[in-house]
A protein has these predicted regions:
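Intrinsically disordered, metal-sensing/regulatory segments
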Residues: 1-258
Length: 258
């Protein structure tokens, strides 16, 4: 039950954020979008460092001076994995007119949902690999530290859910369809978490690689999508300030609960 709730919490965060479309106006002010993107980026960077990369290095201490090796290898595999998906899957970022990925005849709203779905894959994997480490009896990953990551991801999923559902509504979708599209984009987190737990149980020695893999994938999303989004236009410093807020919050959660 503890693990089930842990992997469900981020999805709940997404769903609550998506629900904003049911009672808010169709669009968010640009300053609000930048603030939300900055906050999400801060949480993801802190989670990648404190919850994923540092534990990956600590679990490889038996390798001595080469303890960094699993973290570096896993990190790069994660980056390349997301880079590959980014090129293969047609998607459209919120606020952009130009689609990315392979050429497709998919509609704008479908490609917007796919963009957020891509974003959610590494988040689900990150939560899954933490709970996999806890299940494996890894002394450096506790139920509290896994919960801290789950809560952090859920907190940043709330504004993320609003960021996707409101533009879908602005594109002409009904409130119901905009809500459903946002929720579906979050389902991939549940799937990613479950599959990662299963994979990690089968190859427990690979846990440091899986931790850093999730970190690499998350940081790819931050640099490729969130940092540009939080830095565009006037008053871009609001994105930087909220990045610091998100980073601090995730760091506090990890240290206080972990």
């Amino acid at each position: 039950m503890e693990i089930f709730l842990g992997i469900l919490i981020p999805f709940i965060g997404t769903t609550l954020g998506v629900a904003c479309v049911l009672f808010m106006k169709k669009t968010l002010r640009k300053q609000v979008q930048r603030a939300l993107a900055g906050f999400a980026a801060g949480v993801m960077v802190a989670a990648s460092i404190w919850s994923l990369l540092i534990p990956a290095i600590e679990q490889s201490e038996n390798m001595g001076a080469l303890s960094f090796f699993p973290a570096v290898v896993g990190f790069w595999i994660g980056v390349l994995f997301l880079l590959t998906l980014d090129h293969l899957i047609p998607h459209l970022h919120v606020g952009s007119e130009q689609s990315e990925g392979s050429k497709s005849k998919l509609g704008r709203t479908t490609m917007m949902v796919l963009a957020v779905t891509l974003h959610n894959i590494p988040e689900g994997m990150a939560v899954g690999v933490m709970y996999a480490g806890f299940l494996a009896g890894n002394t450096q990953i506790t139920a509290a530290s896994a919960l801290a990551l789950s809560l952090g991801i859920a907190i940043q999923n709330f504004p993320e859910g609003a960021i996707i559902s409101l533009p879908l509504r602005a594109e002409g979708e009904s409130k119901g369809k905009a809500f459903l599209g946002g929720v579906l984009s979050g389902v991939v987190e549940l799937v990613g978490a479950v599959l990662t737990i299963i994979a990690a149980q089968l190859i427990i020695p690979a846990l440091p690689y899986l931790l850093s893999f999730a970190a690499g994938a998350m940081l790819y999303v931050v640099v490729e999508e969130l940092i540009p989004e939080m830095s565009q236009g006037e008053n871009s410093n609001i994105g930087t300030v909220f990045f610091a807020v998100g980073f601090s919050l995730m760091m506090v959660l990890d240290v206080a609960l972990g």
